[in-house]
């Protein structure tokens, strides 16, 4: 992820979307054994591929049209890197890489877009979902931090933390 981002993603963002740099983060998070560092030269699984995530804030900061332009630019990045091929990005989802709204990512992962959960909600989140939400390798953090990029912005009920 880091090599692919440094070679292709970072230049694309800096050249085509410099105005977004203060607001977006890039990283390698979510589901999949490679997110946890388990895929290596011997044990790569069926969906091992080069790529990274571009996290966007809400539409009040990055509108739909700009997000769409960013999705198209990501889709145009090279399909092969170091002998590995990227999966096709479907407009209806399916890829774990690409442009993702932070609120949508955390809604899928833990059930709340902002991380404000009751004690009961925290206890009901499956372990794998929590792991996917917090096991991150951020390649670039936004200059203007907003939840959920700042870990302590998540409200963990005092009875649990």
Label every model-predicted segment.
Residues 1-11:
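N-terminal regions immediately upstream of nucleotidyltransferase
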Residues 12-53, 59:
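Active-site nucleotide-donor binding segment shared across nucleotidyl transfer reactions
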Residues 64, 68-161:
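Conserved NTP/Mg2+-binding pocket subregion across the NTase superfamily
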Residues 57-65:
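Short coil/turn segments at secondary-structure boundaries
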């Amino acid at each position: 992820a880091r090599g692919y981002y440094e070679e292709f993603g970072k230049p694309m963002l800096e050249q085509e979307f410099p105005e977004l740099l203060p607001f977006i983060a890039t990283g390698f998070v979510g589901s999949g054994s490679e997110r946890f560092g388990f895929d290596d030269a011997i044990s790569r699984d069926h969906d091992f591929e080069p790529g990274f995530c571009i996290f966007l804030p809400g539409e009040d900061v990055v509108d739909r049209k700009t997000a769409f332009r960013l999705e198209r630019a990501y889709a145009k990045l090279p399909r092969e890197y170091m002998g590995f091929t990227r999966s096709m990005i479907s407009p209806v989802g399916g890829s774990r890489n690409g442009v993702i709204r932070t609120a949508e990512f955390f809604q899928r992962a833990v059930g709340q877009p902002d991380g404000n959960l009751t004690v009961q909600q925290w206890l009901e989140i499956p372990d794998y979902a929590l792991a996917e939400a917090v096991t991150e390798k951020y390649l670039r953090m936004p200059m203007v931090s907003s939840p959920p990029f700042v870990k302590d912005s998540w409200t963990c009920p005092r009875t649990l933390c």
